[in-house]
Regions:
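Compositionally biased intrinsically disordered regions enriched in Thr/Gly
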Residues: 1-205
Length: 205
């Protein structure tokens, strides 16, 4: 159906509080059950980013300035992939702190995907992705804190068109000045491993 291929309507909502400018997306879907499920998960991730700032002692009400935002990376064929960010600073901080998360979902089914769910069972996707990331690290001369040990089972990612972007939190594998190390990997590198009904599989059809 043509309707399924149209972009999903996304509404921006805000969390009102002094010195906080936290904006987050809410999807407007015809299926309200899926809408509620996906939007609840988005809000949970937004709150988790805020909690990380608070847990690390960077949040002081009325003093900490915090900006939360989002970017839509993919919105086609019913597949929505977006990133959520939280930036916090206050006078006693030498450097601002930033946290990043993401979510990828099929709005036609309400399924929210972990990285492993993009691929066929028992495929060696992690090995192939690790090899591709290692090659990019060398080619781009990305500074590391130690030896690259590969992606985790719940590795953060998002999808931009037909490209998979694997990323790491600040200080996970690189010094802070590198920011969030991101590794774009075109789908053709592992097309044989992609599950047909996953977001990447749908975008490739």
């Amino acid at each position: 159906m043509e309707q399924e291929r149209l972009p999903v309507t996304i509404k921006t909502k805000a969390i009102p509080a002094p010195k906080l400018s936290i904006y987050y997306p809410q999807l407007l879907l015809s299926n309200k059950t899926y809408q509620q499920k996906i939007n609840k998960r988005i809000y949970q991730k937004v709150y988790h980013l805020f909690s990380k700032v608070n847990q690390q002692g960077y949040y002081q009400p009325g003093i900490t300035e915090m900006i939360g935002d989002y970017e839509v990376k993919n919105n086609q064929c019913g597949i929505v992939s977006l990133t959520l960010s939280n930036f916090a600073t206050m006078p006693t901080l030498a450097h601002p702190v930033t946290f990043l998360d993401s979510i990828t979902t099929n709005t036609q089914t309400g399924i929210i995907y972990q990285l492993n769910e993009l691929f066929k069972p028992n495929s060696q996707y992690r090995q192939r992705i690790n090899e591709l990331i290692a090659a990019q690290i060398k080619e781009r001369d990305i500074q590391l804190l130690g030896t690259f040990k590969g992606i985790g089972p719940n590795q953060k990612y998002y999808i931009a068109d037909k490209t998979l972007i694997i990323y790491f939190d600040m200080y996970d594998i690189s010094p802070g000045y590198v920011g969030f190390p991101m590794f774009p990997i075109p789908s053709f590198h592992f097309q044989d491993m992609i599950h047909d009904t996953s977001p990447l599989g749908i975008l490739l059809t």
